[in-house]
Structures are given as structure tokens and as C-alpha cells.
């Protein structure tokens, strides 16, 4: 592990090297208050494990084998999508996790209308692909849209996602209370 990129409700993400490639490693913590929710989050992340799309963060590997000394349910190794999220660009926060290291700096500057259209196209393409695979993200927000060094948006953080069995039987009945309250769709409030 090279350094911490960020942390959230169910774990921490680190920049690392795996078989010579730069990756992001998510360690899903064992939540003592809500063990079921942390387990569900770990397995939900793996909904996209076999998928490959330019606008979706790719899962490289995963393991539930962790040392007993660690308070972890498992580890997920993902492609490294970069230091910057759409949240950083929209709100002008240029550093990850409050660290002022140049290696963690996000230098995207002002978001022009033209760039917003390009980013929107990337996000819609990723969502269309996920929906074609019967996966709903359920926590789509600027902080979960990563911007690569090639200026491509990738949807990440699938800890709240659901894989639908088939579109006819479950497409209209998504009942979900996770995700970020301030970014929920109105029909889920």
C-alpha cells in the first residue's frame, strides 16, 4: 500500500501496486454496530466484478482472506481511476483526504459547459451499460465519479448497488435505504 486515498462508512481505499500495476485497494471494515450492512456492502461491490466498460471502475481481484489482527471483512482490488472526483471539480476541493501532497492534487480547474457535457456523456454511457447488465448503483453522486488522467469519467463505489434478477420482475420494486441521503432520487426518499 502506498498511501490512503480516502475513507467512508464501510472502509478505506489506498493507492497500491499489484503485479506491477497501479491499483486502488479497498479494505472493507467489519462494522461492529452493523455487521450485516458492512457484509452487504462488500458483496455489493462485487456486482461489477466481471464487467468491463470504459466508464465503470473495473474490479481486478477480491478476497475475504484477511489476517485475524485486521478488523476487515475483505479486500477489493480495483483499477486506479486517478486522484480526482467530480466532487473535487464541482466544489473546487483540489486535494484528497485533506492531504496537501502534490501526488494527491486534483488539477482540473474550472468546469466549463463543454467539459460538463463531455463528463455527462461519460456518466450516461456508464449508467446505460450498468443498467443493461441489470445493475443499479443507488449511490450515484459527484464523489463516486472518478476522473482519470485522460479526462474520462468512471463510475465507482458500488457498495450500495443491487443486481436485479430480471427487468420484468424487479425493475419497478427497488427498495433501498442505503446511499447518501442528500443525493437520493426523490422516489427513494
Curated annotation (Swiss-Prot):
Gene Ontology molecular functions: ATP binding; protein serine kinase activity; protein serine/threonine kinase activity
Protein name listed in UniProt: Serine/threonine-protein kinase mos
Organism: Atheris nitschei
Disulfide bond entries: none
PANTHER family xrefs: SERINE/THREONINE-PROTEIN KINASE TNNI3K-RELATED, V-MOS MOLONEY MURINE SARCOMA VIRAL ONCO HOMOLOG
Active site per UniProt: 139 (proton acceptor)
The entry's keywords: ATP-binding, Kinase, Nucleotide-binding, Serine/threonine-protein kinase, Transferase
Domain Protein kinase: 1-189
Sequence similarity: Belongs to the protein kinase superfamily. Ser/Thr protein kinase family.
EC number(s) reported in the record: 2.7.11.1
Enzyme class per UniProt: transferase
Reaction catalyzed: L-seryl-[protein] + ATP = O-phospho-L-seryl-[protein] + ADP + H(+); L-threonyl-[protein] + ATP = O-phospho-L-threonyl-[protein] + ADP + H(+)
Positions that bind ATP: 5-13, 26
Origin organism lineage: Eukaryota, Metazoa, Chordata, Craniata, Vertebrata
Amino acid at each position: 500500500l502506498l498511501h490512503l486515498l480516502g475513507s467512508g462508512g464501510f472502509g478505506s481505499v489506498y493507492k497500491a501496486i499489484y503485479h506491477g500495476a497501479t491499483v486502488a485497494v479497498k479494505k472493507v471494515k467489519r462494522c461492529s454496530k452493523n455487521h450485516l450492512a458492512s457484509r452487504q456492502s462488500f458483496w455489493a461491490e462485487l456486482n461489477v466484478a466481471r464487467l468491463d466498460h470504459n466508464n465503470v471502475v473495473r474490479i481486478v481481484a477480491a478476497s475475504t482472506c484477511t489476517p485475524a489482527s485486521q478488523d476487515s471483512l475483505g479486500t477489493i482490488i480495483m483499477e486506479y481511476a486517478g486522484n480526482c472526483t467530480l466532487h473535487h471539480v464541482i466544489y473546487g476541493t483540489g486535494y484528497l483526504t485533506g492531504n496537501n501532497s502534490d501526488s494527491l492534487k486534483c488539477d482540473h480547474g474550472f468546469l466549463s459547459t463543454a467539459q460538463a457535457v463531455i463528463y455527462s456523456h461519460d456518466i450516461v454511457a456508464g449508467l446505460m451499460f450498468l443498467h443493461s447488465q441489470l445493475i443499479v448503483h443507488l449511490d450515484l453522486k459527484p464523489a463516486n465519479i472518478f476522473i482519470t488522467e485522460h479526462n474520462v469519467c468512471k463510475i465507482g463505489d458500488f457498495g450500495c448497488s443491487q443486481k436485479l434478477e430480471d427487468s420484468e420482475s424487479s425493475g419497478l420494486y427497488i427498495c433501498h435505504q442505503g446511499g447518501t441521503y442528500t443525493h437520493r432520487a426523490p422516489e427513494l426518499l
